[in-house]
From Swiss-Prot:
Residues 3-147 form the Globin domain. InterPro entries: Globin, Globin-like_sf, Globin/Proto, Hemoglobin_b, Hemoglobin_oxygen_transport. GO terms for biological process: hydrogen peroxide catabolic process. Heterotetramer of two alpha chains and two gamma chains in fetal hemoglobin (Hb F). Keywords: Acetylation, Heme, Iron, Metal-binding, Oxygen transport, Phosphoprotein, S-nitrosylation, Transport. One of its GO terms (cellular component) is haptoglobin-hemoglobin complex. The gene is HBG1. The modification N6-acetyllysine is found at K60, K83. Signal peptide: none annotated. This is Hemoglobin subunit gamma-1.
Length: 147
Protein backbone atom coordinates (compact mmCIF):
# COMPACT_ATOMS: atom_id res chain seq x y z
CA UNK A 1 0.00 0.00 0.00
CA UNK A 2 2.97 2.27 0.42
CA UNK A 3 4.62 3.41 3.60
CA UNK A 4 4.18 7.01 4.64
CA UNK A 5 7.19 8.69 6.17
CA UNK A 6 6.71 11.26 8.91
CA UNK A 7 7.63 13.85 6.28
CA UNK A 8 4.89 12.56 3.94
CA UNK A 9 2.35 12.74 6.76
CA UNK A 10 3.37 16.27 7.71
CA UNK A 11 3.29 17.41 4.06
CA UNK A 12 -0.14 15.88 3.41
CA UNK A 13 -1.64 17.14 6.68
CA UNK A 14 -0.24 20.65 6.25
CA UNK A 15 -1.71 21.13 2.77
CA UNK A 16 -4.98 19.42 3.72
CA UNK A 17 -5.52 22.04 6.42
CA UNK A 18 -5.69 24.68 3.67
CA UNK A 19 -8.00 22.78 1.29
CA UNK A 20 -11.53 24.09 0.84
CA UNK A 21 -13.27 20.70 0.81
CA UNK A 22 -16.42 22.01 -0.86
CA UNK A 23 -14.67 23.83 -3.71
CA UNK A 24 -11.93 21.27 -4.32
CA UNK A 25 -14.35 18.34 -4.02
CA UNK A 26 -16.83 19.75 -6.51
CA UNK A 27 -14.09 20.68 -8.94
CA UNK A 28 -12.40 17.28 -8.63
CA UNK A 29 -15.55 15.22 -9.24
CA UNK A 30 -16.69 17.64 -11.94
CA UNK A 31 -13.39 17.37 -13.79
CA UNK A 32 -13.49 13.56 -13.50
CA UNK A 33 -16.92 13.51 -15.16
CA UNK A 34 -15.82 15.90 -17.92
CA UNK A 35 -12.39 14.40 -18.67
CA UNK A 36 -13.51 10.76 -18.33
CA UNK A 37 -17.14 10.89 -19.55
CA UNK A 38 -17.70 7.14 -19.13
CA UNK A 39 -17.64 7.73 -15.35
CA UNK A 40 -20.94 9.62 -15.69
CA UNK A 41 -22.86 6.35 -15.85
CA UNK A 42 -22.48 5.99 -12.08
CA UNK A 43 -24.24 9.32 -11.54
CA UNK A 44 -27.50 8.93 -13.51
CA UNK A 45 -29.48 10.42 -10.63
CA UNK A 46 -27.49 13.67 -10.77
CA UNK A 47 -29.57 15.18 -13.58
CA UNK A 48 -27.99 17.30 -16.30
CA UNK A 49 -24.46 16.13 -17.13
CA UNK A 50 -24.72 17.09 -20.80
CA UNK A 51 -21.82 19.56 -20.98
CA UNK A 52 -18.78 20.69 -19.03
CA UNK A 53 -20.59 23.80 -17.79
CA UNK A 54 -23.65 21.75 -16.77
CA UNK A 55 -21.44 19.30 -14.86
CA UNK A 56 -19.30 21.96 -13.16
CA UNK A 57 -22.43 23.88 -12.10
CA UNK A 58 -24.42 20.83 -10.98
CA UNK A 59 -25.20 21.06 -7.24
CA UNK A 60 -25.35 17.26 -6.88
CA UNK A 61 -21.84 16.95 -8.37
CA UNK A 62 -20.60 19.60 -5.93
CA UNK A 63 -22.31 17.92 -2.96
CA UNK A 64 -20.96 14.46 -3.79
CA UNK A 65 -17.50 15.89 -4.45
CA UNK A 66 -17.56 17.43 -0.98
CA UNK A 67 -18.61 14.04 0.44
CA UNK A 68 -15.71 12.32 -1.37
CA UNK A 69 -13.14 14.79 -0.06
CA UNK A 70 -14.63 14.62 3.44
CA UNK A 71 -13.98 10.87 3.44
CA UNK A 72 -10.48 11.60 2.16
CA UNK A 73 -10.04 13.69 5.31
CA UNK A 74 -10.72 10.51 7.32
CA UNK A 75 -7.98 8.79 5.34
CA UNK A 76 -5.53 11.57 6.12
CA UNK A 77 -6.15 10.96 9.83
CA UNK A 78 -5.51 7.21 9.31
CA UNK A 79 -2.70 7.01 6.77
CA UNK A 80 -1.33 3.87 8.43
CA UNK A 81 -4.65 2.03 7.99
CA UNK A 82 -6.14 3.10 4.68
CA UNK A 83 -7.54 -0.36 4.00
CA UNK A 84 -9.41 -0.39 7.31
CA UNK A 85 -10.58 3.19 6.84
CA UNK A 86 -12.11 2.39 3.46
CA UNK A 87 -13.36 -1.17 4.10
CA UNK A 88 -17.05 -0.20 4.05
CA UNK A 89 -16.70 2.19 1.10
CA UNK A 90 -14.79 -0.48 -0.82
CA UNK A 91 -17.60 -2.96 -0.20
CA UNK A 92 -20.25 -0.42 -1.26
CA UNK A 93 -18.47 0.57 -4.47
CA UNK A 94 -17.63 -3.04 -5.37
CA UNK A 95 -20.70 -5.05 -4.37
CA UNK A 96 -23.52 -2.55 -4.75
CA UNK A 97 -22.37 0.14 -7.18
CA UNK A 98 -20.02 -2.02 -9.31
CA UNK A 99 -17.60 0.86 -9.86
CA UNK A 100 -14.56 0.01 -11.97
CA UNK A 101 -11.65 0.31 -9.51
CA UNK A 102 -9.62 2.14 -12.16
CA UNK A 103 -11.94 5.10 -11.54
CA UNK A 104 -10.48 5.52 -8.04
CA UNK A 105 -7.03 5.99 -9.54
CA UNK A 106 -8.38 8.48 -12.08
CA UNK A 107 -10.14 10.46 -9.34
CA UNK A 108 -6.94 10.60 -7.30
CA UNK A 109 -4.99 11.90 -10.26
CA UNK A 110 -7.65 14.55 -10.93
CA UNK A 111 -7.46 15.61 -7.27
CA UNK A 112 -3.68 16.04 -7.56
CA UNK A 113 -4.28 18.23 -10.63
CA UNK A 114 -6.87 20.33 -8.78
CA UNK A 115 -4.53 20.79 -5.81
CA UNK A 116 -1.74 21.88 -8.16
CA UNK A 117 -4.08 24.46 -9.71
CA UNK A 118 -5.28 25.74 -6.33
CA UNK A 119 -1.89 25.89 -4.61
CA UNK A 120 0.44 26.83 -7.48
CA UNK A 121 4.07 27.24 -6.40
CA UNK A 122 3.26 25.84 -2.95
CA UNK A 123 2.48 22.50 -4.65
CA UNK A 124 6.15 21.59 -5.10
CA UNK A 125 7.33 18.30 -6.63
CA UNK A 126 7.91 17.00 -3.08
CA UNK A 127 4.35 17.90 -2.07
CA UNK A 128 3.05 16.28 -5.23
CA UNK A 129 5.03 13.09 -4.52
CA UNK A 130 3.50 12.78 -1.03
CA UNK A 131 -0.01 13.45 -2.31
CA UNK A 132 0.42 11.04 -5.22
CA UNK A 133 1.50 8.35 -2.76
CA UNK A 134 -1.59 9.08 -0.67
CA UNK A 135 -4.14 9.03 -3.51
CA UNK A 136 -2.53 5.84 -4.84
CA UNK A 137 -2.89 4.29 -1.39
CA UNK A 138 -6.52 5.38 -1.16
CA UNK A 139 -7.29 3.97 -4.63
CA UNK A 140 -5.67 0.70 -3.62
CA UNK A 141 -7.66 0.59 -0.36
CA UNK A 142 -10.92 1.29 -2.20
CA UNK A 143 -10.06 -1.46 -4.68
CA UNK A 144 -9.21 -4.02 -1.98
CA UNK A 145 -12.67 -5.60 -2.04
CA UNK A 146 -12.21 -6.42 -5.73
CA UNK A 147 -9.26 -8.77 -5.18
Amino acid sequence: MGHFTEEDKATITSLWGKVNVEDAGGETLGRLLVVYPWTQRFFDSFGNLSSASAIMGNPKVKAHGKKVLTSLGDAIKNLDDLKGTFAQLSELHCDKLHVDPENFRLLGNVLVTVLAIHFGKEFTPEVQASWQKMVTGVASALSSRYH
